């Protein structure tokens, strides 16, 4: 069961790493497409911030057999550009699971895009910053992993919004 869960987590990581930021390649993680959103499964919560609609899927709306270690998936949908960011947030994980999952994510990212580069707030990123990963720990020694994949027109959406839309999820990292 534990190995199966790690395999599924690896598939999540691969899914988040497996897109091109090329505007002509409309593929996005989880079988979604960058750009206009016509139909999505019923979310746990929808909230709006200026030109961005956050569509949040919590564990209650995620298939437990396919995403057992997922706490949330957040879609950032821009008014004019459509879907421009997908954020995957793990449940809190013990050391061994976090280490194995991060090793798999780094291996996949490095294989696809080359060596990761350091980003802001102690993140690592690939593909010119289009895919970012970060991890935090709580006071009980458990760890949470965040991965964000950006769409091809995220900069335009961020300009309309007044600041980078990645700032929203990076606040969860709690790092200056």
Task: Describe the predicted segments one by one.
Residues 9-16:
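Gram-negative bacterial Sec-dependent N-terminal signal peptides
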Residues 18-20:
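N-terminal signal peptide c-region/cleavage motif recognized by signal peptidases
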Residues 23-62, 89-176:
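Non-cytosolic coordination micro-motifs
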Residues 57-82:
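Compositionally biased P/S/T/G-rich terminal and signal peptide-adjacent segments
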């Amino acid at each position: 069961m534990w190995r199966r869960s790690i395999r599924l987590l690896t598939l999540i990581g691969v899914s988040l790493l497996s897109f091109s930021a090329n505007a002509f390649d409309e593929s996005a993680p989880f079988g979604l497409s960058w750009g206009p959103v016509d139909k999505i499964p019923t979310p746990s919560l929808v909230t709006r911030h200026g030109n961005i609609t956050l569509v949040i899927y919590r564990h209650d709306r995620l298939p437990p057999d396919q995403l057992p270690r997922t706490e949330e998936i957040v879609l950032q949908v821009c008014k004019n550009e459509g879907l421009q960011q997908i954020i995957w947030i793990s449940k809190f994980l013990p050391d061994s699971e976090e280490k194995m999952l991060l090793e798999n994510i780094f291996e996949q990212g490095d294989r696809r895009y080359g060596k990761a580069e350091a980003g802001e707030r102690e993140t690592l990123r690939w593909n010119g910053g289009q895919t970012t990963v970060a991890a935090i720990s709580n006071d009980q020694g458990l760890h949470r992993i965040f991965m964000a994949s950006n769409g091809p027109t995220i900069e335009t959406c961020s300009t309309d919004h007044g600041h980078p839309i990645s700032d929203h999820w990076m606040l969860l990292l709690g790092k200056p």
